[in-house]
């Protein structure tokens, strides 16, 4: 039986599910950019790409060299094809306008070019997260200049989302709104090949991911929930749990998608004015779309992530996502 490449899968989606050709082309271009980023990441010190730039992004985070390189790769790969009206990146202050010399399309691309970049110098997994939205009609005319407002759509409006994870293998995990597929990069072929046909998250779990060093800063519902997890089979949950933490959302969520679990990045008392740490548009929305399509759930502790109306490109949010039972439990504690 012949192997199904990403290109073949997308063509079959166009035939069977009427996936627009422009969306198919967009996903293929993003995938090619991810292959280029994977190549740059794999070179490491040999390519002179390790270390920091000495600059900060709009989030106030020190930019790694590969943050900037990955951002440029995605911009240059996607700006010319005629399938996008604009782009937004975690690494840029403002929305990216498609240069006037190129045709414009009906979609918006939002991305975190290199999630978990603090892991680069220690050779731990990193990844690229992306989300695709339709551009509102008023911005498709030549009379209305594209601005931030075009991107401020709730996660329910995503038409596609995915991530590439650069680890022992490079994988692309994708949803077009009809389940979650996983593609592994065959470096000899140069193609992403379908290896995980229907990714599903078990409803219950015995694993969780959280940065325990921040415990003293958590709100009471999170402290209560984690204490119950740590109590194991002698506690109220009556089973033992394992904790995992890679310090890259893309790696922690990938583990949860492939074998179940709960990922938590709650708000804390160090910055009480901020509702959380992770970015709604670049991280929480695409990952929540994937998790829900895989049968899981995702909330900010109070409401469904995908229902949140964004107020800014770089809005932050608390995140609890993964197996349904555990997400429901910790969300319920926030409501008590």
Swiss-Prot record:
Residues at which substrate binds: 115-118, 211, 277
Ligand binding (Mg(2+) 2): 112, 115, 283
GO annotation, biological process: fructose 1,6-bisphosphate metabolic process; fructose 6-phosphate metabolic process; fructose metabolic process; gluconeogenesis; sucrose biosynthetic process
Top-level EC class: hydrolase
GO cellular component: cytosol
Keywords: Carbohydrate metabolism, Cytoplasm, Hydrolase, Magnesium, Metal-binding
Transmembrane segments: none
Sections of the chain in a coiled coil: none
Reaction catalysis annotation: beta-D-fructose 1,6-bisphosphate + H2O = beta-D-fructose 6-phosphate + phosphate
Cell compartment(s), UniProt: Cytoplasm
Cofactor: binding details: Binds 2 magnesium ions per subunit.
Binding site for Mg(2+) 1: 90, 112, 114
Keyword Magnesium: yes
InterPro entries: FBPase_C_dom (IPR044015), FBPase_class-1 (IPR000146), FBPase_N (IPR033391), FBPtase (IPR028343)
Pathway annotation from the record: Carbohydrate biosynthesis; gluconeogenesis
Gene Ontology molecular function: any one: fructose 1,6-bisphosphate 1-phosphatase activity
PANTHER family (alphabetical): FRUCTOSE-1,6-BISPHOSPHATASE-RELATED, SEDOHEPTULOSE-1,7-BISPHOSPHATASE, CHLOROPLASTIC
Oligomeric and partner information: Homotetramer.
Name of protein: Fructose-1,6-bisphosphatase class 1
């Amino acid at each position: 039986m012949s192997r199904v490449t990403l290109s073949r899968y997308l063509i079959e989606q166009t035939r069977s599910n009427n996936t627009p050709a422009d969306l198919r082309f967009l996903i293929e271009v993003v995938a090619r950019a991810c292959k280029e980023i994977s190549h740059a990441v794999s070179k490491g010190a040999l390519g002179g790409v390790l270390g920091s730039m000495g600059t900060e992004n709009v989030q106030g985070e020190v930019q790694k060299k590969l943050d900037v390189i990955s951002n440029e790769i995605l911009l240059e790969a996607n700006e010319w094809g005629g399938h996008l009206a604009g782009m937004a990146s975690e690494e840029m202050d403002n929305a990216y306008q498609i240069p006037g010399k190129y045709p414009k399309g009906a979609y918006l691309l939002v991305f975190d070019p290199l999630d978990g970049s603090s892991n680069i110098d220690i050779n731990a997994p990193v990844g690229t997260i992306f989300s695709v939205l339709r551009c509102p009609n008023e911005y498709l005319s030549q009379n209305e200049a594209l601005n931030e407002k075009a991107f401020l759509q709730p996660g329910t409006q995503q038409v596609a989302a995915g991530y590439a994870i650069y680890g022992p293998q490079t994988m692309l995990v994708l949803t077009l709104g009809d389940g979650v597929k996983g593609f592994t990069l065959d470096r000899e072929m140069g193609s992403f090949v379908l290896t995980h046909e229907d990714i599903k998250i078990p409803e219950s779990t015995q694993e969780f991911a959280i940065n325990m060093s921040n415990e003293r800063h958590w709100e009471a519902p999170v402290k209560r929930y984690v204490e119950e997890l740590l109590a194991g089979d002698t506690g109220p949950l009556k089973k033992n749990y394992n904790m995992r933490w890679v310090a890259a959302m893309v790696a922690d969520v990938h583990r949860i998608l492939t074998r179940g679990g709960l990922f938590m990045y709650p708000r804390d008392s160090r910055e009480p004015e901020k509702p959380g740490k992770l970015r709604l548009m670049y991280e929480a929305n695409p990952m929540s779309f994937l998790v829900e399509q895989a049968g899981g759930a995702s909330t900010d502790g109070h409401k469904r992530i995908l229902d949140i109306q964004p107020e800014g490109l770089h809005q932050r949010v608390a995140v609890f996502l993964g197996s349904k039972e555990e997400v429901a439990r910790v969300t319920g504690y926030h409501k008590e």
